Amino acid sequence: MPGLTIGDTVPNLELDSTHGKIRIHDYVGNGYVILFSHPGDFTPVCTTELAAMANYAKEFEKRGVKLLGISCDDVQSHKEWTKDIEAYKPGSKVTYPIMADPDRSAIKQLNMVDPDEKDAEGQLPSRTLHIVGPDKKVKLSFLYPSCTGRNMDEVVRAVDSLLTAAKHKVATPANWNPGECVVIAPGVSDDEAKKMFPQGFETADLPSKKGYLRFTKV
């Protein structure tokens, strides 16, 4: 069966967490949620990642985005491990919930399984991160192996891109950062673009002369 991917609705699972029972759709509500998995508690890369998430929590909060972690460890393990996370990065308070999936059924439904990483109980979660929108659908996914920690600056940049695209009906080019030019979707005619973007736009002069690469500011 194909795994959860961009455009799919996230299963409305209910799981125990460090903040009590959580039903995913209720947690998403009318906003955006970063739903991320880690292979295991009390492991080195995961400790640095969840500390980084805690460090960046205010950046996500400013954008109206909530965090939600998950792994196959139990709630008590998550709570004990949180002490290590916060000690590793003093000032990094883990305020977001971490869900428990001891039977690993949720990580399978969320397409968060690492086929190459196992323990005595079975396959472990990968470093998967889904950005879920208000419609409960996956807007973007990152998938990393256990050996590679995530880059939080790129997660923030991806969130900014999604929010900008949703608000202004544009797309963001390679290496884009907030404040830089965005591109106009090819389905928008020049006449429509003039109405949508009264500030104007520039069309790149390319050999094909197709006029499809148009930049504007929002």
From Swiss-Prot:
Residue ranges crossing the lipid bilayer per the database entry: none
GO cellular component entries: cytosol; nucleus
InterPro entries referenced in this protein's UniProt entry, alphabetically: AhpC/TSA, Peroxiredoxin_AhpC-typ, Peroxiredoxin_C, PRX_1cys, Thioredoxin-like_sf, Thioredoxin_domain
PROSITE patterns to which the protein is assigned, alphabetical: THIOREDOXIN_2 (PS51352)
Claim: Cell cycle is one of the keywords in the record: no
Occurrences of domain Thioredoxin (ranges): 4-164
Motif (Bipartite nuclear localization signal): 194-217
Enzyme kind, highest EC tier: oxidoreductase
Keywords assigned: Antioxidant, Cytoplasm, Nucleus, Oxidoreductase, Peroxidase, Redox-active center
Catalytic reactions of this protein: a hydroperoxide + [thioredoxin]-dithiol = an alcohol + [thioredoxin]-disulfide + H2O
Keyword Lipid biosynthesis: no
Miscellaneous comment: The active site is a conserved redox-active cysteine residue, the peroxidatic cysteine (C(P)), which makes the nucleophilic attack on the peroxide substrate. The peroxide oxidizes the C(P)-SH to cysteine sulfenic acid (C(P)-SOH), which then reacts with another cysteine residue, the resolving cysteine (C(R)), to form a disulfide bridge. The disulfide is subsequently reduced by an appropriate electron donor to complete the catalytic cycle. In this 1-Cys peroxiredoxin, no C(R) is present and C(P) instead forms a disulfide with a cysteine from another protein or with a small thiol molecule.
Protein name in the entry: 1-Cys peroxiredoxin PER1
Organism: Triticum aestivum (Wheat)
Gene: PER1
